[in-house]
Amino acid sequence: MFSINARTKVPIWVPFIARKGFSMSTRQLAEPKLNQVSSLNTRNIGIIAHIDAGKTTTTERMLFYSGKTTTMGDVDQGDTVTDYLPSERSRGITIQSAAITIPWNNNKINIIDTPGHADFTFEVIRSLRVLDGCVTILDAVAGVEAQTEKVWKQAQALKIPRIAFVNKMDRPGAGFSRTVKEVVQKLQTKVVLCNIPYFEMSKDDAVFVGVIDILHNKILKWNIDEDPNGRDITVIDLQEAKESHQEAYMEALKCRESMVETLGGIEETVVDAFLECDEDYMKIPSSILKSAIRKACISNQVTPVFCGSAFRKIAVQPLLDGVVDYLPSPLQTPVPEITASTSKVSKKQKQKKNSKVSSVPIEMNPKKGLIVNKNPQLTVALAFKVMTHATRGVMTFFRVYSGSLTSNTTVVNTRTGKKLHLNKVLLMHGDTPEPVSQISSGNIGVITGTENDVITGDTLVSHGPVKRNFTDLETSIKLLPIEIPPPLFNSSIEPLTAGDARYMNECINTLIREDPSLNVNVDEELGQTILSGMGELHLEIVRDRLINDMKAKIRLRNVAVSFKETVSKPSLEVVKASKNDGLVKVEVSLEAIDGPAEESTHADENGSVLLETDNNVVKLPPEAAASHINESLSERRWKSEHSLEELNDIILQGITTGLQLGGPILGLPLHSVVVRVIHWDFPVEGKEVSASMLLDASRQVVREALSKLPESSFCILEPIMSTRVYVDSGSMGEVVHDLSHRCSAHITSIEDESENMDSNAWANEEAENLYLPQDYTMKSGKNAVNFTNKKVVVAETPLRDMVGYLSKLRSITQGRGVFDMTYLGMRRAIRPVLLDS
């Protein structure tokens, strides 16, 4: 603990305070040295929250205070660094996750700002896969909101440590303590208050001006009137000023007592220090408490809580300190799941859960980081995002898990087995790339020039500058894949003129490469292109990007729910298709799947391939190939320019297209169908035949198999959602009636939120026993959310009836009701209802 005058004016985050426990320095690492920071001093963090909680604003303040930018971007002005897409700036929301690297107090922080809207959940999912820690932004007025709870649980499932920042403390109706209590009860976590809000009275209102630092027993007051950029801070030592600031001192004392009690139940060192200090809470060294908080946070036993107002530029700097102090470095995170599978998977397929895999030797070296296959020179990286840059073309974001990815090196994509040469590796600053010599273990970077060779979820391996051959094990290494949620909404898209079609298709391919949760199906017979996405806003943004950003001349029809067709009765008949006078043959039969394909018995069979979309399975066993094909391969008489693996992939492509062309009822894509390949043939020794013949035959045989079934053998499926509606008890009756009648919902339960919390008694008890300061701003807060007597209506609802539901819910509840939905699966739809829609 350092000693300064009772009131010390601090014009900026000055170095002498940094040496005593606060990081108040604006002197940061020069850009060339930033990439040389060790893994131990690196933090990979994500900013996660509900929409409009202040994620992007908080990120912009972090950039400014770190010295990365010289001015602060503003969401309302549309000049933020991380929201760089025109659609993001015009709407004031985050659509794509953006990566940026900043310095802070001799550390490096890689930040990913993620979207908050449910339509862009996939952006959050793929970002979480490469993070070591998260900052959860909470709106102090709204409290813990639906999307916050959902993203929190996603991070929790991946065991990612989190810290919380209660934002918007300057707003009328802000409730710091109420929000923290919700964090404990709803998010099921213990907390320690690292700082609490500090108010000064102005007439009859309490004005948020700073924070009370619990660890160092000081008031930090931001003098915004003197420096609008939030760098003029007054520091008040409460130990010396406890007479003049008695109320603040007592709050700090009670919060510190609560902190020690919480940490004492986790770390014995805190109990020992408490006893050594004669049971005086204020005498326990802050270094011991800080170390205990860090250990408890990294082990996911505690969530450190900070507060502030990013918009008013108050208390963002202590949050940055918290990121460095409490979130883990790449050397302190759980070892990622790494397997080796010799099967190569196309981008239209899923890796089966029961694929033959072998474990890969991995160890965490305290200095070098992760070492894979006992080879310190082996680099293993995960591609988690692809975007198109205005001047540099296709850029692939990756996280290095072991080794270093250097410029001018060769990598292998273990999904395809293809070798790729990398000229440069880059760091990203919003949408601006910065070339560097290498990206070391634990860091996030970008590569270019991989337009059609790398997709989201691919694992890349390299030996760096060392010239040596890759072993079979190394080229089969795979990091845990990134799951892509199914698209739920459709919209047909068409060019304004025939001459606009080619550019339209190029633009669509660009968007799909960037966003795997966006799908496209082309009906060549009808000349119709169908785009599928996660929601109405998702497809609306796609339209805006195509028309406004890419200048494509297109017309996008009304967005509709994504219905599918399926086979309700299996076809025992084997259907044949042949091309080129019988030289090319494919024979198949059709079956149906009940439930997720990966959990069915079909997935266990030899040769089963789970298609990426629509829960379909293709069974292509080795014995289905004509005998001469396998003989030619074993006897080395193979002359075809296509390998056996490539021919199998062509068959899969043809079958996939055949299923996407739709069923007989409404021409909707087929869902939950098993296509069993009984036999196939292709000349591989003598006469050269185009592989397109095999592609056409594979597609044709599926179409013929479908056409031979009577229409009564098909039914239509629609997406069903698990819906939770949060309302006051006074509105519950009308909400339930509306859900049951207008939305065709099946109400499964009605829960009292307090009873729901009681089901997790420990969290409820923890929240009640936790000391929390008084919420001054709630006295005058007309906009505060009323969390008393809250009800949760749980229902299963057809997605078609939930389109536009939010506006109806707000009308019923006077703007207070909220809801969230999770995809349950596809179920049989009532045909008259479908035709009416």
From Swiss-Prot:
Cellular component GO terms, alphabetical: mitochondrion
Entry GO MF terms: GTP binding; GTPase activity
Biological processes annotated in GO: mitochondrial genome maintenance; mitochondrial translation; regulation of mitochondrial membrane potential; ribosome disassembly
Residues that hold GTP according to the record: 49-56, 113-117, 167-170
Basic residues bias: start-end ranges: 345-355
Primary location group: mitochondrion
Keywords noted in UniProt: GTP-binding, Mitochondrion, Nucleotide-binding, Protein biosynthesis, Transit peptide
Domain tr-type G: residue ranges: 40-331
Transit peptide residue numbers: 1-29
Disordered as annotated region, ranges: 338-359
Pfam families linked to this entry: EF-G_D2 (PF22042), EFG_C (PF00679), EFG_III (PF14492), GTP_EFTU (PF00009)
Keyword Transit peptide: yes
Compartments reported by the entry: Mitochondrion
SMART domains in alphabetical order: EFG_C
Keyword GTP-binding: yes
Protein family membership: Belongs to the TRAFAC class translation factor GTPase superfamily. Classic translation factor GTPase family. EF-G/EF-2 subfamily.
Function per UniProt: Mitochondrial GTPase that mediates the disassembly of ribosomes from messenger RNA at the termination of mitochondrial protein biosynthesis. Not involved in the GTP-dependent ribosomal translocation step during translation elongation.
Identification of the protein by name: Ribosome-releasing factor 2, mitochondrial
Organism field: Meyerozyma guilliermondii (strain ATCC 6260 / CBS 566 / DSM 6381 / JCM 1539 / NBRC 10279 / NRRL Y-324) (Yeast)
Gene name of the encoded protein: MEF2
